[in-house]
Amino acid sequence: MAKVNEWKTAISTDATDLISLQHMIDCGITAMELSVSAACVHEIDWQGLRDHAAAVGMEVWSYHLPFADAINIAAPDESARAAAVARQCGLIDLANAIGVRRFVIHPSAEPIPDDERSAWMASAKKSLAELAEYAAARDSVICVEDLPRTCLGHTADEMLELIAVDDRLRVCFDVNHLCTAYGCTHAEFVEKLGDKIVTTHMSDYDFIDEKHFFPGVGLINWKSLIELLEDAGYDGPFLYEGGFSPSHWAPEKPYGTIETARERHMTIKELTGAE
C-alpha cells in the first residue's frame, strides 16, 4: 500500500515548452496532466511535448480531454453526441502517439434540467462505452471525472452507474467537486469507488461548490482524505488541478506556487481543515 509521500507530485497544466517543464522538475514535480482548453487544442505541439518531457524526465501521466458545450458526450441529440465522441477519439489518437495512456473526461456538460437527466445519462453511458473500447484498443484507459452541481457524476452512485457500462472504465477523483447539496462525502466516494480511482485532481474548497484552492486554503480535512485513499490502495500521483493563481470563484483567497507544491504534498497530512 503506497503512502502519500511515495506518490509522485504532479500538476495539471497547459505548458509544453522546455523551460516550463524543466522548472517543474527542478521544483520536484515529476509528472503532469496536459490540460488545454477546447478552443486551443489545435495549438498543441505534441511532438514538442514528447521531446521536451523526455529531455527533462517529465512523465506525461494523463491528458485531460477538452470539455465544452460543443463537446458534450452526454448530449441527448444523437448527432451531437456522436460528433463529440469522434472529436475525443481524434484527440486520444494524437496523445496516444506520444505515449499518453490515461485520458480524463467529463461525463457531461451543464446545466442539466431534472426532466432531461435520464436522457443525458443514457447518452453519456453510450459514449463512455464507445470511448472505453476505443481507448482499450490503444492500450489506454478512460478516467471518468466526478463533477459538481447538476453535472453527471456528482455522487458516488452516479459515478458507479456511469462506469458500470464497461469494466475498463476508471475514475479520476476530483476532491473539490463533491457538493454538500448532493449528499456524497469523500468517505462514501472512496468506499464505493476506491478500487477504480487511478488518478486525482487535488485542490481545496468549501464543500458548497468547486473552488480549486491550494490545499489548506479551504475546509478539507486532508489527513482524513489522504488516509482514505491510502487505505483504498491508491498509488497514482498527487496531482494538483488549480491553486496556483487566484481562484475564479474567490480571487481574494491566497494561492500556492510551483515552488511550494512539492512541500505541500509532503506535509499534506498535517492539514486537518474543518471537515
Regions found by a protein language model. Give the residues of each.
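Histidine-acidic metal/acid-base catalytic patches
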Residues: 1-6, 15-25, 101, 153, ...
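Residue-level detector of anion-binding/catalytic polar loops
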Residues: 30-31, 59, 101, 141, ...
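Conserved beta-strand positions
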Residues: 11, 32-34, 105, 144, ...
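Active-site acidic/histidine proton-transfer and metal-coordination neighborhood
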Residues: 55, 74-170, 180
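N-terminal pre-domain/capping segments
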Residues: 1-96, 170, 195, 255-275
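Catalytic-core regions built around general acid/base machinery
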Residues: 46-57, 127-134, 188-192, 224-228
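Metal-dependent catalytic neighborhoods of phosphoester/phosphodiester hydrolases
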Residues: 43-46, 114-115, 249-251
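Active-site-proximal loop/turn and secondary-structure-junction residues that shape catalytic pockets
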Residues: 15-17, 36-38, 66-69, 109-111, ...
